[in-house]
């Protein structure tokens, strides 16, 4: 597809901003993640009126927050000035990893993220859990876990969601 001109390979640098159009920019944000074949980045997408963090995968909140010297998730998101954060929701808990451990497949469980966040506050960004494994009970809109997320003021990603930036 690269040879056909469908994709263009562009090397990006952390902390640099890249224009996609006159009104849309992206900024790569390095996040700690098992370095199997390359480094790992989240992306901030900034539009004319709002911005979105795309963080589908990282290892552990402690590692990510320590990397940015942030005391908690809220302060880290505030430092990036994002309105919406699409965050790693791979597993609800480590119990979903049959035959493997969270050390082997590190993702912060949604249950841990909720413990760290608690209820959504007035100036918090909208947080949406994405990148869910097939074992994650958040897929079931009638599950207790799904209800817990929404009762705290956060959201569970759905196929076809759109965000106006």
Regions found by a protein language model. Give the residues of each.
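Active-site HxH/HxHxD metal-binding segment of metal-dependent hydrolases
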Residues: 1-4
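Active-site regions of enzymes building and remodeling cell-envelope glycoconjugates
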Residues: 6-9, 26, 151-156
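Core dinuclear metal-dependent hydrolase active-site scaffold
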Residues: 9-78, 160-165
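Cap/insert and terminal regions of metallo-dependent hydrolase folds
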Residues: 51, 59-160
């Amino acid at each position: 597809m690269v040879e056909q001109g469908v994709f263009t390979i562009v090397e990006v640098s952390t902390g640099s901003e890249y224009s996609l159009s006159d009104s849309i920019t992206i900024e790569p944000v390095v996040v700690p993640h098992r370095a199997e074949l390359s480094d790992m980045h989240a992306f901030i997408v900034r539009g004319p009126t709002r911005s979105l963090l795309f963080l589908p995968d990282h290892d552990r909140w402690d590692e990510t927050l320590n990397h940015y010297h942030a005391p908690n998730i809220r302060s880290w998101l505030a430092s990036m000035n994002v309105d919406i954060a699409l965050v790693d929701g791979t597993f609800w808990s480590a119990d979903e990893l049959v035959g493997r451990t969270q050390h082997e497949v590190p993702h912060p469980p949604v249950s841990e993220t909720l413990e760290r966040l608690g209820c959504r506050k007035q100036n918090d960004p909208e947080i949406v859990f994405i990148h869910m494994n097939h074992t994650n009970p958040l897929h079931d809109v009638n599950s207790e876990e799904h209800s817990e997320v929404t009762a705290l003021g956060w959201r569970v990603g759905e196929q076809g969601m759109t965000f106006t930036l």
